[in-house]
């Protein structure tokens, strides 16, 4: 029995700091989630925490999410996922052209393929985590502008 306790004790000594760090990370993530949820609620949105721990909200019939990155609180990312399903290889090529066009034309946004769909997001660094409040409306406007550029290029290619 004694021979088993010693290795377990040593294992505990090495693992205890990892458990403490995980708890600190969850506290940081919860604090960031609360900050985003409180702000969005004040702005009239109805935010929820999604299964990944990100903050999801709807605006004008679209579902957005704010990526919660607890180990980099001054990184701010808001995403509109699944704006255009890719239904064929020909359409995939058109999407790549439209993504390139949108990325070249729209300020700050990134359009990209995720599996068989198009996502558009904003990624930026801010001095303090709370500073996202100062740029949120402009980010949403820019994000929607990126979507508009993507969709217009897709429609142009499809003859609409």
Model regions and ranges:
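Second-shell loop/turn segments in exported
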Residues: 23-27, 82-86, 126-136, 140
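Hydrophobic h-region of N-terminal signal peptides that target proteins for export
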Residues: 12-21
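Short, internal acidic amphipathic alpha-helical interface segments
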Residues: 80-121
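Sec/Tat-exported extracytoplasmic proteins
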Residues: 43-47, 59, 103-106, 147-154, ...
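Bacterial N-terminal signal peptides that target proteins for export
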Residues: 1-9
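C-terminal partner/receptor-binding element of secreted or periplasmic proteins
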Residues: 129-160
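N-terminal secretory signal peptides
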Residues: 22-75
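Extracytoplasmic/secreted envelope proteins and their assembly/folding machinery
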Residues: 33, 37, 96, 133, ...
């Amino acid at each position: 029995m004694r021979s088993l306790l010693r290795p377990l004790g040593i294992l505990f000594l090495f693992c205890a700091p990892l458990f403490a760090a995980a708890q600190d990370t969850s506290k940081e993530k919860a604090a960031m989630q609360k900050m985003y949820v409180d702000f969005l609620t004040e702005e009239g949105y109805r935010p929820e925490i999604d299964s990944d721990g990100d903050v999801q909200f709807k605006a004008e019939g679209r579902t957005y999410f704010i990526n919660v990155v607890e180990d980099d609180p001054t990184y701010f990312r808001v995403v509109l996922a699944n704006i255009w399903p890719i239904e064929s290889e020909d359409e995939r090529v058109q999407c790549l052209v439209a993504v390139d066009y949108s990325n070249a034309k729209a300020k700050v946004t990134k359009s990209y393929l995720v599996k068989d769909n198009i996502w558009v997001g904003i990624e930026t660094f801010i001095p303090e985590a709370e500073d996202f409040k100062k740029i949120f409306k402009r980010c949403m406007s820019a994000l929607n502008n990126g979507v508009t550029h993507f969709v217009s290029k897709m429609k142009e290619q499809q003859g609409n």
